Amino acid sequence: MDDKSRGTTDAQHHATDADRPPDDGSAGLPEPGSVKSKIGLFTAQSTQKALEGERDKSATFRPRPPQQAAAQLAMQKPPVPVNKPVTLGRMNSTPELRQTEPQGSDDRAEPDLPMPKPVRNMTADADTVEKLLQDNRELPVRNPPILHRNPAMQPATSPRSPDIASVSATKPRPPPPRKGGAKPVPKSPSRSEPKIHGGQQSYEPLSNSDMDLTGADEARPKLPRRPDASPVTHIPPSDHRVLLEAHERSKRHLAPSSPLLDRSLQNNGSSPDLIDYSPGLDEEAMSDAIVASSLASRKAPSAKKFPPPPPPQRQRGTHSLLRPNTSNSDSPRSSSPASSLRHTLRPPTKIGEEEFDHHKHRKHIIHRHPHKHHEGDRKRWQSEVTEKERKRYEGVWAANKGLLIPISNSKERSSHEETSSECYPPSASEMVLNIVVRDIWARSRLPSSILEQIWNLVDRQKIGLLTREEFVVGMWLIDQQLKGHKLPVKVPDSVWDSVRGVPGIRIPKVPSR
């Protein structure tokens, strides 16, 4: 160091010393300015520089841990294939392999603190590193625990030694893999394996959850070997609904169960509800199984369905109101009415005619356009009595004619009877008395005033008796009133002409020209 630089350094050092507060150690130093003081300052400066250089060197060339040395050695030498990584239980317990936390260099640290010393000599060659690793492997292993252990994975580049083989022999092995073409599950990177970032190797200990899972896997009992079965027996989880439906169909005995499904149920276990899903089955085999089961159920004979019994036939016979337990179907219908009623000249009506006449007037149940005016379609006042109506009315007349009319000989008549105003014509036996007419017409439930008007319209003799034509016209007017027609002021001659025919003889009508 030349004089110029030395003088500059002395001046700087003198300035820093002047700025620094005086301490206890500087009390014994000689006064500045003398030769002795300059020598002391130079010696102190050189000592301080040496300490700073040694500190920088220790901070820059910090000894690397053995893991970094092993990683550097792995990069230099080709990797040796290792079949299975071996876990050592006591490897982390050695103080040599524990990774020391780097102590950050602090420029403000006091100079009197002890300096860190390197653990390993960084100039050691590869043989020294291998020897160190072998020494660590030769540590005694005393019954490593299964559930709680601190494993440290061996680097993949280190050769396999007989000690490692003995340790791996004592480790319990997992059960053998199942047969059935199961796909290998990709191994997830465990925390115990070394992770290399940027050429450096770091070790991370296993967590409690990982150790518990490992212990549970090792404590699980071995499963029995599955018998040889076709690959169709495996059922993917995507088609479980179809197979469950097929299984329910076999329970109902509607179709024989598929042999593929039965075989899969036998292989899976005694319980038919538990289906073993294997992810190793391809989609083609599963589709073949579904098609086979559907064909088997389709070709199976369906259950015989017997038709329901026919309903019992209804009895056409009508039950009597007086005798509800007896039916009139067995006894033939009598052509004559009951004995309490008087016989008429009219024969009993047939059932077919009554039904035809009943349906004749009820063709249109729903009236179309009820408020529309149909002048030409409406039924006008009837100008004549039909043959059917005349026969019905003549039957009532024949049953009631001559009632309550006294019949006496002319010789037996007294003078008082001859002089009386009450005299009947000789044909009174063919007429109906007014009392009988009132009793018959009152059954129509028409007002007495309407019945009186009808009597006045048909009573042409004014003797209290009605002939056959008068009685028939009166009955016809009652029916017209019940149908809604108004009573005429005078009965037209066409109505009288229609009822003048001989009873029982039909006179054909002459067409008008």
UniProtKB/Swiss-Prot annotation:
PROSITE patterns: EH
Matches recorded under PANTHER family: AT21416P, EH DOMAIN
Organism this protein belongs to: Neosartorya fischeri (strain ATCC 1020 / DSM 3700 / CBS 544.65 / FGSC A1164 / JCM 1740 / NRRL 181 / WB 181)
GO biological process: lipid metabolic process
Compositional bias annotation for Basic and acidic residues: 1-23, 128-140, 217-228, 237-248, 374-383
Lineage: Eukaryota, Fungi, Dikarya, Ascomycota, Pezizomycotina
Coiled-coil ranges per UniProt: none
Similarity annotation: Belongs to the IRS4 family.
InterPro entries associated with the record: EF-hand-dom_pair, EH_dom
Basic residues composition bias: residue spans: 359-373
Protein name listed in UniProt: Increased rDNA silencing protein 4
Pfam family, one: EH
